[in-house]
Protein backbone atom coordinates (compact mmCIF):
# COMPACT_ATOMS: atom_id res chain seq x y z
CA UNK A 1 0.00 0.00 0.00
CA UNK A 2 2.78 2.41 0.85
CA UNK A 3 4.60 4.34 -1.85
CA UNK A 4 7.72 2.28 -1.25
CA UNK A 5 5.81 -0.90 -2.08
CA UNK A 6 5.02 -0.78 -5.76
CA UNK A 7 2.38 -3.31 -6.76
CA UNK A 8 4.50 -5.87 -8.60
CA UNK A 9 1.81 -6.83 -11.08
CA UNK A 10 1.29 -3.20 -12.02
CA UNK A 11 5.00 -2.68 -12.50
CA UNK A 12 5.30 -5.72 -14.76
CA UNK A 13 2.24 -4.79 -16.79
CA UNK A 14 3.51 -1.28 -17.37
CA UNK A 15 6.69 -2.45 -19.08
CA UNK A 16 7.24 -1.72 -22.71
CA UNK A 17 4.05 0.22 -23.35
CA UNK A 18 4.93 2.76 -20.68
CA UNK A 19 8.36 3.17 -22.22
CA UNK A 20 6.79 3.79 -25.60
CA UNK A 21 4.45 6.34 -24.02
CA UNK A 22 7.38 8.14 -22.47
CA UNK A 23 9.15 8.19 -25.81
CA UNK A 24 6.04 9.67 -27.40
CA UNK A 25 5.69 12.30 -24.69
CA UNK A 26 9.30 13.48 -24.93
CA UNK A 27 9.95 12.97 -28.66
CA UNK A 28 9.08 16.55 -29.45
CA UNK A 29 11.31 17.96 -26.73
CA UNK A 30 14.21 15.78 -27.82
CA UNK A 31 13.86 16.87 -31.43
CA UNK A 32 13.41 20.53 -30.58
CA UNK A 33 15.26 20.76 -27.30
CA UNK A 34 15.69 24.47 -27.48
CA UNK A 35 12.05 25.42 -27.13
CA UNK A 36 10.12 23.04 -24.90
CA UNK A 37 6.89 24.54 -26.28
CA UNK A 38 5.68 21.72 -28.53
CA UNK A 39 1.97 20.94 -28.27
CA UNK A 40 1.52 17.64 -26.41
CA UNK A 41 -1.25 15.16 -27.25
CA UNK A 42 -4.31 15.83 -25.14
CA UNK A 43 -5.35 13.21 -22.62
CA UNK A 44 -8.42 12.32 -24.64
CA UNK A 45 -6.42 11.72 -27.83
CA UNK A 46 -4.74 8.72 -26.21
CA UNK A 47 -7.94 6.95 -25.09
CA UNK A 48 -10.68 4.85 -26.65
CA UNK A 49 -13.95 6.75 -27.34
CA UNK A 50 -15.81 5.72 -24.18
CA UNK A 51 -12.84 6.72 -22.03
CA UNK A 52 -12.48 9.97 -23.97
CA UNK A 53 -16.06 10.82 -23.10
CA UNK A 54 -15.58 10.03 -19.40
CA UNK A 55 -12.44 12.17 -19.19
CA UNK A 56 -14.08 15.06 -21.06
CA UNK A 57 -17.07 15.00 -18.71
CA UNK A 58 -14.82 14.86 -15.65
CA UNK A 59 -12.86 17.86 -16.93
CA UNK A 60 -16.12 19.74 -17.49
CA UNK A 61 -17.21 18.97 -13.91
CA UNK A 62 -14.22 20.88 -12.50
CA UNK A 63 -14.22 24.64 -13.10
CA UNK A 64 -10.50 24.97 -13.79
CA UNK A 65 -8.72 26.03 -16.97
CA UNK A 66 -6.39 23.17 -17.87
CA UNK A 67 -3.30 24.09 -19.93
CA UNK A 68 -3.08 22.45 -23.35
CA UNK A 69 0.70 22.67 -23.73
CA UNK A 70 3.25 20.83 -21.66
CA UNK A 71 5.23 22.94 -19.24
CA UNK A 72 2.71 25.72 -18.70
CA UNK A 73 2.00 26.80 -15.10
CA UNK A 74 -0.19 24.34 -13.24
CA UNK A 75 -3.62 25.69 -12.28
CA UNK A 76 -4.80 25.93 -8.69
CA UNK A 77 -8.12 24.74 -7.32
CA UNK A 78 -10.36 27.76 -6.67
CA UNK A 79 -13.24 27.97 -4.26
CA UNK A 80 -16.35 26.90 -6.10
CA UNK A 81 -14.38 24.52 -8.31
CA UNK A 82 -17.48 22.31 -8.53
CA UNK A 83 -20.34 24.54 -9.79
CA UNK A 84 -22.51 21.43 -9.68
CA UNK A 85 -21.51 19.23 -6.74
CA UNK A 86 -20.45 15.71 -7.59
CA UNK A 87 -22.75 12.88 -6.63
CA UNK A 88 -22.34 12.19 -2.92
CA UNK A 89 -19.73 9.46 -2.48
CA UNK A 90 -17.49 7.73 0.02
CA UNK A 91 -14.10 9.08 1.06
CA UNK A 92 -11.68 6.49 2.45
CA UNK A 93 -8.50 7.51 4.25
CA UNK A 94 -5.61 5.32 5.40
CA UNK A 95 -4.02 6.02 8.77
CA UNK A 96 -0.71 4.10 9.09
CA UNK A 97 0.67 3.20 12.48
CA UNK A 98 3.39 5.86 12.33
CA UNK A 99 0.75 8.61 12.13
CA UNK A 100 -1.25 7.48 15.17
CA UNK A 101 -1.08 10.07 17.92
CA UNK A 102 0.52 12.68 15.70
CA UNK A 103 -2.27 13.31 13.21
CA UNK A 104 -5.85 14.46 13.68
CA UNK A 105 -7.78 13.58 10.51
CA UNK A 106 -10.79 15.58 9.39
CA UNK A 107 -13.21 12.85 10.37
CA UNK A 108 -16.20 14.85 9.20
CA UNK A 109 -14.89 14.65 5.64
CA UNK A 110 -14.41 10.87 5.70
CA UNK A 111 -16.59 7.83 5.30
CA UNK A 112 -14.06 5.24 6.42
CA UNK A 113 -10.82 5.42 8.39
CA UNK A 114 -8.48 2.49 7.68
CA UNK A 115 -5.75 1.64 10.18
CA UNK A 116 -2.65 0.20 8.49
CA UNK A 117 -1.67 -2.45 9.56
CA UNK A 118 -1.08 -5.83 11.18
CA UNK A 119 0.82 -8.56 9.33
CA UNK A 120 -0.50 -11.84 7.98
CA UNK A 121 1.25 -15.05 9.05
CA UNK A 122 1.92 -18.10 6.89
CA UNK A 123 -0.91 -20.17 8.38
CA UNK A 124 -3.47 -17.36 8.31
CA UNK A 125 -2.63 -16.17 11.80
CA UNK A 126 -1.93 -12.57 12.78
CA UNK A 127 1.73 -11.88 13.53
CA UNK A 128 1.91 -10.65 17.13
CA UNK A 129 4.86 -8.37 16.56
CA UNK A 130 5.79 -5.32 14.54
CA UNK A 131 4.95 -1.69 15.18
CA UNK A 132 1.51 -1.92 13.60
CA UNK A 133 0.41 -4.70 15.94
CA UNK A 134 2.08 -3.11 18.96
CA UNK A 135 0.35 0.21 18.33
CA UNK A 136 -3.01 -1.49 17.95
CA UNK A 137 -2.65 -3.55 21.13
CA UNK A 138 -1.44 -0.52 23.11
CA UNK A 139 -4.82 1.13 22.74
CA UNK A 140 -3.29 4.16 21.03
CA UNK A 141 -5.80 3.88 18.19
CA UNK A 142 -8.69 4.23 20.63
CA UNK A 143 -8.92 8.01 20.40
CA UNK A 144 -9.00 7.92 16.61
CA UNK A 145 -11.63 5.18 16.62
CA UNK A 146 -13.83 7.08 19.06
CA UNK A 147 -13.53 10.33 17.11
CA UNK A 148 -14.21 8.57 13.81
CA UNK A 149 -17.28 6.82 15.18
CA UNK A 150 -18.53 10.08 16.66
CA UNK A 151 -18.34 11.56 13.16
CA UNK A 152 -20.19 8.57 11.72
CA UNK A 153 -17.12 6.97 10.13
CA UNK A 154 -16.39 3.30 9.89
CA UNK A 155 -12.97 2.14 11.10
CA UNK A 156 -11.30 -0.82 9.38
CA UNK A 157 -8.18 -2.78 10.32
CA UNK A 158 -5.74 -3.66 7.52
CA UNK A 159 -4.17 -7.10 7.31
CA UNK A 160 -1.03 -6.76 5.20
CA UNK A 161 1.44 -9.02 3.43
CA UNK A 162 3.78 -8.66 0.49
CA UNK A 163 5.71 -11.83 1.37
CA UNK A 164 5.59 -14.28 -1.53
CA UNK A 165 6.15 -17.21 0.84
CA UNK A 166 3.32 -16.17 3.17
CA UNK A 167 0.94 -15.52 0.29
CA UNK A 168 1.79 -18.84 -1.35
CA UNK A 169 1.23 -20.62 1.95
CA UNK A 170 -2.25 -19.21 2.60
CA UNK A 171 -3.19 -19.72 -1.06
CA UNK A 172 -2.04 -23.34 -0.88
CA UNK A 173 -4.17 -24.04 2.22
CA UNK A 174 -6.94 -21.52 1.61
CA UNK A 175 -9.84 -22.95 3.59
CA UNK A 176 -7.98 -23.41 6.86
CA UNK A 177 -5.90 -20.24 6.47
CA UNK A 178 -8.90 -18.07 5.62
CA UNK A 179 -10.89 -19.36 8.57
CA UNK A 180 -7.90 -18.96 10.89
CA UNK A 181 -7.42 -15.34 9.83
CA UNK A 182 -11.05 -14.56 10.60
CA UNK A 183 -10.80 -16.30 13.97
CA UNK A 184 -7.61 -14.36 14.77
CA UNK A 185 -8.87 -10.98 13.62
CA UNK A 186 -12.31 -11.13 15.27
CA UNK A 187 -11.00 -10.56 18.83
CA UNK A 188 -8.98 -7.56 17.63
CA UNK A 189 -12.05 -6.08 15.96
CA UNK A 190 -14.16 -6.64 19.06
CA UNK A 191 -11.55 -5.24 21.43
CA UNK A 192 -11.09 -2.15 19.31
CA UNK A 193 -14.79 -1.74 18.47
CA UNK A 194 -13.81 -1.74 14.80
CA UNK A 195 -16.16 -2.15 11.86
CA UNK A 196 -14.32 -4.56 9.60
CA UNK A 197 -11.20 -5.55 7.74
CA UNK A 198 -9.16 -4.27 4.82
CA UNK A 199 -7.13 -6.99 3.08
CA UNK A 200 -3.91 -5.57 1.63
CA UNK A 201 -2.36 -8.79 0.32
CA UNK A 202 0.05 -7.82 -2.47
CA UNK A 203 0.90 -10.99 -4.38
CA UNK A 204 2.45 -11.43 -7.81
CA UNK A 205 2.07 -15.12 -8.68
CA UNK A 206 -0.40 -16.49 -11.21
CA UNK A 207 -0.11 -19.86 -9.46
CA UNK A 208 -1.56 -18.35 -6.27
CA UNK A 209 -4.54 -16.78 -8.07
CA UNK A 210 -7.18 -19.54 -7.63
CA UNK A 211 -6.10 -20.37 -4.09
CA UNK A 212 -6.28 -16.73 -3.04
CA UNK A 213 -9.92 -16.57 -4.14
CA UNK A 214 -10.69 -19.56 -1.92
CA UNK A 215 -8.73 -17.97 0.93
CA UNK A 216 -10.76 -14.76 0.72
CA UNK A 217 -14.00 -16.72 0.45
CA UNK A 218 -13.21 -18.74 3.57
CA UNK A 219 -12.16 -15.62 5.44
CA UNK A 220 -15.29 -13.65 4.52
CA UNK A 221 -17.68 -16.46 5.38
CA UNK A 222 -16.05 -17.16 8.73
CA UNK A 223 -15.84 -13.50 9.68
CA UNK A 224 -19.51 -12.94 8.94
CA UNK A 225 -20.43 -15.95 11.04
CA UNK A 226 -18.33 -14.64 13.93
CA UNK A 227 -19.50 -11.04 13.75
CA UNK A 228 -22.45 -10.18 11.54
CA UNK A 229 -22.05 -6.64 10.28
CA UNK A 230 -18.27 -6.62 9.93
CA UNK A 231 -17.34 -5.46 6.45
CA UNK A 232 -14.47 -6.55 4.19
CA UNK A 233 -12.56 -4.38 1.72
CA UNK A 234 -9.88 -5.78 -0.61
CA UNK A 235 -7.03 -3.74 -2.12
CA UNK A 236 -6.21 -4.54 -5.77
CA UNK A 237 -3.92 -3.34 -8.57
CA UNK A 238 -4.80 -1.04 -11.49
CA UNK A 239 -4.30 -3.94 -13.91
CA UNK A 240 -6.24 -6.57 -11.99
CA UNK A 241 -9.56 -6.30 -13.84
CA UNK A 242 -8.00 -7.04 -17.23
CA UNK A 243 -4.96 -9.18 -16.39
CA UNK A 244 -5.88 -12.89 -16.71
CA UNK A 245 -2.45 -13.91 -15.42
CA UNK A 246 -2.39 -11.50 -12.49
CA UNK A 247 -2.68 -12.36 -8.81
CA UNK A 248 -6.22 -10.97 -8.35
CA UNK A 249 -9.20 -12.63 -10.04
CA UNK A 250 -11.47 -9.62 -9.64
CA UNK A 251 -14.58 -11.21 -11.09
CA UNK A 252 -14.35 -14.10 -8.63
CA UNK A 253 -13.19 -12.11 -5.61
CA UNK A 254 -15.95 -9.51 -5.82
CA UNK A 255 -18.44 -12.21 -4.78
CA UNK A 256 -16.92 -12.36 -1.31
CA UNK A 257 -15.98 -8.81 -0.38
CA UNK A 258 -18.00 -5.65 0.03
CA UNK A 259 -15.70 -3.24 -1.79
CA UNK A 260 -12.49 -3.13 -3.78
CA UNK A 261 -9.97 -0.39 -3.12
CA UNK A 262 -8.13 0.01 -6.43
CA UNK A 263 -4.56 1.12 -5.74
CA UNK A 264 -4.47 3.33 -8.83
CA UNK A 265 -0.97 4.65 -8.32
CA UNK A 266 2.67 3.68 -8.77
CA UNK A 267 1.87 3.49 -12.48
CA UNK A 268 4.94 5.48 -13.49
CA UNK A 269 7.77 4.12 -15.61
CA UNK A 270 10.85 4.38 -13.37
CA UNK A 271 13.03 4.95 -16.44
CA UNK A 272 11.18 8.07 -17.57
CA UNK A 273 9.96 11.09 -15.61
CA UNK A 274 6.26 10.30 -15.49
CA UNK A 275 3.08 10.49 -13.45
CA UNK A 276 2.40 8.00 -10.69
CA UNK A 277 -1.38 8.24 -11.22
CA UNK A 278 -2.21 9.47 -14.74
CA UNK A 279 -5.81 10.46 -15.35
CA UNK A 280 -5.18 9.35 -18.92
CA UNK A 281 -2.34 8.22 -21.19
CA UNK A 282 -1.50 5.48 -23.69
CA UNK A 283 -1.22 2.64 -21.19
CA UNK A 284 -2.06 2.48 -17.47
CA UNK A 285 -4.31 5.31 -16.32
CA UNK A 286 -7.36 5.98 -14.20
CA UNK A 287 -9.84 6.19 -17.07
CA UNK A 288 -8.87 2.84 -18.58
CA UNK A 289 -8.59 1.24 -15.14
CA UNK A 290 -12.11 2.27 -14.10
CA UNK A 291 -13.54 1.28 -17.48
CA UNK A 292 -12.04 -2.19 -17.15
CA UNK A 293 -13.20 -2.65 -13.55
CA UNK A 294 -16.70 -1.43 -14.37
CA UNK A 295 -16.90 -4.02 -17.15
CA UNK A 296 -16.53 -6.94 -14.73
CA UNK A 297 -18.21 -5.70 -11.53
CA UNK A 298 -20.62 -3.03 -10.29
CA UNK A 299 -18.86 0.32 -10.18
CA UNK A 300 -20.82 1.06 -7.02
CA UNK A 301 -18.44 -1.28 -5.17
CA UNK A 302 -15.22 0.35 -6.42
CA UNK A 303 -13.18 2.89 -4.46
CA UNK A 304 -10.59 4.68 -6.59
CA UNK A 305 -7.31 4.99 -4.70
CA UNK A 306 -5.45 8.30 -5.10
CA UNK A 307 -1.86 8.95 -3.97
CA UNK A 308 -0.88 11.86 -1.75
CA UNK A 309 2.72 11.46 -2.84
CA UNK A 310 4.80 11.53 -5.99
CA UNK A 311 8.27 10.70 -7.24
CA UNK A 312 11.40 12.78 -7.69
CA UNK A 313 13.26 11.67 -10.84
CA UNK A 314 16.86 12.65 -11.61
CA UNK A 315 16.62 13.41 -15.34
CA UNK A 316 18.71 14.05 -18.44
CA UNK A 317 17.03 17.38 -19.14
CA UNK A 318 14.24 19.70 -18.08
CA UNK A 319 11.65 18.65 -20.64
CA UNK A 320 8.40 16.80 -20.06
CA UNK A 321 9.06 13.05 -20.13
CA UNK A 322 12.84 13.21 -19.96
CA UNK A 323 14.67 9.89 -19.48
CA UNK A 324 15.66 9.30 -15.86
CA UNK A 325 19.31 9.04 -14.90
CA UNK A 326 18.66 7.20 -11.64
CA UNK A 327 15.94 5.63 -9.55
CA UNK A 328 12.96 7.83 -8.57
CA UNK A 329 12.52 8.65 -4.89
CA UNK A 330 9.10 8.87 -3.23
CA UNK A 331 8.18 12.27 -1.79
CA UNK A 332 4.96 13.32 -0.05
CA UNK A 333 2.61 16.02 -1.26
CA UNK A 334 3.30 18.10 1.85
CA UNK A 335 7.06 17.87 1.23
CA UNK A 336 6.59 18.95 -2.38
CA UNK A 337 4.54 21.97 -1.31
CA UNK A 338 7.07 22.87 1.39
CA UNK A 339 9.85 22.90 -1.22
CA UNK A 340 8.15 25.95 -2.74
CA UNK A 341 8.77 25.14 -6.41
CA UNK A 342 6.17 26.33 -8.91
CA UNK A 343 4.59 23.31 -10.63
CA UNK A 344 3.86 23.04 -14.33
CA UNK A 345 1.17 20.95 -16.01
CA UNK A 346 1.26 17.84 -18.16
CA UNK A 347 -1.85 17.80 -20.41
CA UNK A 348 -1.36 14.15 -21.39
CA UNK A 349 -1.72 12.72 -17.89
CA UNK A 350 -3.52 15.74 -16.36
CA UNK A 351 -1.04 15.92 -13.49
CA UNK A 352 1.50 18.50 -12.26
CA UNK A 353 5.24 18.25 -11.94
CA UNK A 354 8.11 20.49 -10.87
CA UNK A 355 11.42 20.96 -12.67
CA UNK A 356 14.57 22.08 -10.87
CA UNK A 357 18.31 21.63 -10.61
CA UNK A 358 20.05 20.14 -7.59
CA UNK A 359 23.83 19.98 -7.34
CA UNK A 360 24.11 20.66 -11.04
CA UNK A 361 21.66 17.96 -12.14
CA UNK A 362 18.11 18.20 -13.48
CA UNK A 363 15.23 16.77 -11.47
CA UNK A 364 11.50 16.38 -12.11
CA UNK A 365 8.99 15.63 -9.37
CA UNK A 366 5.66 14.25 -10.59
CA UNK A 367 2.75 14.12 -8.16
CA UNK A 368 -0.94 14.79 -7.60
CA UNK A 369 -2.29 18.11 -6.36
CA UNK A 370 -5.81 19.38 -5.58
CA UNK A 371 -6.60 19.96 -9.28
CA UNK A 372 -5.53 16.50 -10.43
CA UNK A 373 -7.26 14.97 -7.40
CA UNK A 374 -10.45 16.88 -8.25
CA UNK A 375 -10.33 15.47 -11.78
CA UNK A 376 -9.95 11.95 -10.38
CA UNK A 377 -12.88 12.47 -8.01
CA UNK A 378 -14.99 13.70 -10.92
CA UNK A 379 -13.94 10.74 -13.06
CA UNK A 380 -14.84 8.27 -10.31
CA UNK A 381 -18.24 9.95 -9.99
CA UNK A 382 -18.76 9.72 -13.75
CA UNK A 383 -18.12 5.99 -13.64
CA UNK A 384 -20.54 5.61 -10.73
CA UNK A 385 -17.90 4.47 -8.26
CA UNK A 386 -18.59 4.11 -4.56
CA UNK A 387 -16.03 6.82 -3.95
CA UNK A 388 -12.39 7.73 -3.67
CA UNK A 389 -9.68 7.07 -1.12
CA UNK A 390 -6.16 8.21 -0.31
CA UNK A 391 -2.85 6.74 0.73
CA UNK A 392 -2.23 8.22 3.23
CA UNK A 393 -3.88 10.97 5.27
CA UNK A 394 -0.72 12.39 6.84
CA UNK A 395 0.88 13.10 3.47
CA UNK A 396 -1.58 15.92 2.72
CA UNK A 397 -0.10 18.12 5.42
CA UNK A 398 -3.55 19.34 6.43
CA UNK A 399 -4.20 21.04 3.07
CA UNK A 400 -7.92 21.87 2.98
CA UNK A 401 -7.83 22.02 -0.82
CA UNK A 402 -7.02 18.31 -0.94
CA UNK A 403 -10.11 17.59 1.16
CA UNK A 404 -12.23 19.83 -1.07
CA UNK A 405 -10.95 18.02 -4.15
CA UNK A 406 -11.87 14.63 -2.71
CA UNK A 407 -15.36 15.73 -1.68
CA UNK A 408 -16.23 17.44 -4.96
CA UNK A 409 -18.62 19.90 -3.36
CA UNK A 410 -20.67 17.19 -1.62
CA UNK A 411 -20.83 15.91 1.93
CA UNK A 412 -19.29 12.45 2.30
CA UNK A 413 -21.55 9.44 2.40
CA UNK A 414 -21.84 8.06 5.92
CA UNK A 415 -22.47 4.32 6.23
CA UNK A 416 -24.15 2.53 9.14
CA UNK A 417 -21.50 1.24 11.51
CA UNK A 418 -21.01 -2.52 11.31
CA UNK A 419 -23.57 -2.66 8.48
CA UNK A 420 -22.80 -4.41 5.22
CA UNK A 421 -24.36 -5.86 2.09
CA UNK A 422 -25.44 -9.51 2.01
CA UNK A 423 -22.71 -11.94 1.02
CA UNK A 424 -23.08 -13.10 -2.58
CA UNK A 425 -21.81 -16.57 -3.41
CA UNK A 426 -22.04 -17.89 0.13
Regions found by a protein language model. Give the residues of each.
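N-terminal secretory signal peptides that target proteins for export/translocation
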Residues: 1-10
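Bacterial signal peptide processing site
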Residues: 27-32
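Glycan-recognition patch characteristic of GH18 chitinases/ENGases
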Residues: 36-187, 416
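Glycan-binding loop/region signatures in secreted carbohydrate-active enzymes
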Residues: 53-81, 301, 306-379, 404-426
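Alpha-helical scaffolding within the catalytic cores
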Residues: 97-103, 138-144, 180-187, 240-251, ...
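Conserved, mostly hydrophobic/aromatic
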Residues: 113, 199, 260, 304, ...
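Active-site groove signature of glycoside hydrolases
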Residues: 117, 182-211, 262-266
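Substrate-binding surface in catalytic domains of secreted glycosidases
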Residues: 123-139, 204-339
Amino acid sequence: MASTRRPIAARLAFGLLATLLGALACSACNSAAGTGTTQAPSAAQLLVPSEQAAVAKAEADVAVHLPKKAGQPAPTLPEGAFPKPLRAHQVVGFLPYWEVGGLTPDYGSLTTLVYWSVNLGATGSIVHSGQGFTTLRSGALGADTAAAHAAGDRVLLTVFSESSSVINSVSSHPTSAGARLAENIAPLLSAGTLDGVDLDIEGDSTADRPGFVKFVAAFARTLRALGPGWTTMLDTYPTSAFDPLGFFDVKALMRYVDQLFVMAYDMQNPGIASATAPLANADLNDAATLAQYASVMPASRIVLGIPLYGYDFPTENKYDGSPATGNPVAVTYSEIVAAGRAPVWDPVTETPYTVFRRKGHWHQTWFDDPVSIALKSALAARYGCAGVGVWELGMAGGDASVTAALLGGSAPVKLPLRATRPLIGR
